[in-house]
């Protein structure tokens, strides 16, 4: 897996001061996407064990960091899920900080359904480590810059614990 960039101190992609990991690769290609350069799966740098350690160590060494946000590109693209499922679990275990994730897929039909277009053997493990999921494709016709943490009205902020899903 590759990543486009890492921001170590951001406030725009979730509550508090967060680390944002922008992964590479997306086949959804939403019209008006703010990160179209990250559609290419080989864009940016390779996500290595050293990269993981640097992110985790930064979170552990800086108490003001609220957590990690994973966005893209598309974190739930089947090609990214194995690496990210393992990483977010490790991040959660080692830091006990929150994890937010943005996806253009819809939770119920694309991720949870066994025949969902982004469902893989890693999806449930990935979802189990996430505290907040922002789902739904960016829709330029529903764009609304006044919405907190979302770009369009069709996107949802889902607090995973509150959903009581049996994942």
Where are these regions (language model features)?
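N-terminal pre-triad scaffold of radical SAM enzymes
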Residues: 2-29
């Amino acid at each position: 897996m590759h990543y486009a960039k890492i921001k170590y101190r951001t406030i725009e992609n979730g509550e508090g001061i967060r680390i944002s990991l922008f992964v590479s690769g997306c086949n959804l290609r939403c019209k008006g996407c703010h990160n179209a350069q990250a559609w290419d799966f080989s864009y940016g740098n390779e996500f290595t064990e050293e990269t993981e350690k640097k992110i985790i160590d930064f979170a552990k060494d800086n108490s003001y960091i609220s957590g990690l946000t994973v966005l893209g590109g598309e974190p739930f693209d089947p090609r990214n899920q194995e690496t990210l499922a393992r990483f977010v679990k490790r991040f959660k275990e080692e830091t006990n900080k929150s994890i937010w994730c943005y996806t253009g897929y819809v939770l119920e039909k694309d991720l949870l359904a066994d025949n969902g277009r982004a469902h893989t053997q890693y999806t449930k493990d990935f979802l189990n480590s996430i505290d907040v999921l922002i789902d739904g494709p960016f829709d330029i016709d529903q764009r609304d810059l006044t919405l907190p943490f979302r770009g369009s009205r069709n996107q949802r902020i889902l607090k995973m614990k509150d959903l009581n899903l049996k994942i």
